[in-house]
């Protein structure tokens, strides 16, 4: 079991119960899932780019990504409905906790010119989204084998009812928010 999950059960739950005055342990917000998304718009011209992006995402997450297709045709972007234009992975359970642990302790500190994550990236319902400009911050990606530096979107979905609850949950995990 991931250390972060044990830490959540042993300490974070108690801390949040006293902070927000919950009556039941089930009211305490928890991390539900983490979604990693990589949009590869250049895949229209070269299909190999999408395969490489999917391989990077598989290495980062530990599971095979789903290839996302265009929902509708857009002439300005030269895409048709059904064209593969990206890939995504949804992490739950054990893999989710392991990824969150790696993200907080290893990947985020390796971001260039890092001054903390924005605390304003909550969606109003306690879910946090962030963008990473380079996939090479993850230790699973071999820098020498990277064909192109790509970014990815990371969305942490929680059961929190408000942004304050979500922020408190992630702050309890020592999420490096900007002061």
UniProtKB/Swiss-Prot annotation:
The keyword Ribosomal protein applies. It comes from the Bacteria. Keywords: Ribonucleoprotein, Ribosomal protein, RNA-binding, rRNA-binding, tRNA-binding. It holds the Pfam family Ribosomal_L5_C. One of its GO terms (molecular function) is rRNA binding. GO terms for biological process: translation. The keyword rRNA-binding applies. One of its GO terms (cellular component) is ribosome. InterPro entries: Ribosomal_uL5, Ribosomal_uL5_bac-type, Ribosomal_uL5_C, Ribosomal_uL5_CS, Ribosomal_uL5_dom_sf, Ribosomal_uL5_N. PANTHER family: 60S RIBOSOMAL PROTEIN L11-RELATED. Part of the 50S ribosomal subunit; part of the 5S rRNA/L5/L18/L25 subcomplex. Contacts the 5S rRNA and the P site tRNA. Forms a bridge to the 30S subunit in the 70S ribosome. This is one of the proteins that bind and probably mediate the attachment of the 5S RNA into the large ribosomal subunit, where it forms part of the central protuberance. In the 70S ribosome it contacts protein S13 of the 30S subunit (bridge B1b), connecting the 2 subunits; this bridge is implicated in subunit movement. Contacts the P site tRNA; the 5S rRNA and some of its associated proteins might help stabilize positioning of ribosome-bound tRNAs. This is Large ribosomal subunit protein uL5.
């Amino acid at each position: 079991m991931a250390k972060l999950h044990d830490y959540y059960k042993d300490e974070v739950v108690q801390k949040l119960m006293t902070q927000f005055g919950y009556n039941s342990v089930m009211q305490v917000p928890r991390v539900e899932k983490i979604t990693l998304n990589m949009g590869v718009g250049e895949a229209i011209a070269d299909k190999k780019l999408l395969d490489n992006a999917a391989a990077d995402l598989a290495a980062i997450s530990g599971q095979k990504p789903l290839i996302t297709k265009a929902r509708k045709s857009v002439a300005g972007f030269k895409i048709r409905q059904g064209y593969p234009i990206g890939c995504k992975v949804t992490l739950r359970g054990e893999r989710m906790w392991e990824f969150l642990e790696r993200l907080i302790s290893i990947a985020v500190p390796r971001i260039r010119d890092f001054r903390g994550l924005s605390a304003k990236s909550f969606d109003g319902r306690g879910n946090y989204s962030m963008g990473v400009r380079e996939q090479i911050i993850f230790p699973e990606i071999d820098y020498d084998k990277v064909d192109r530096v790509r970014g990815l979107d990371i969305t942490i979905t929680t059961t929190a009812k408000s942004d304050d609850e979500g922020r408190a949950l992630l702050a309890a995990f020592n999420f490096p928010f900007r002061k």
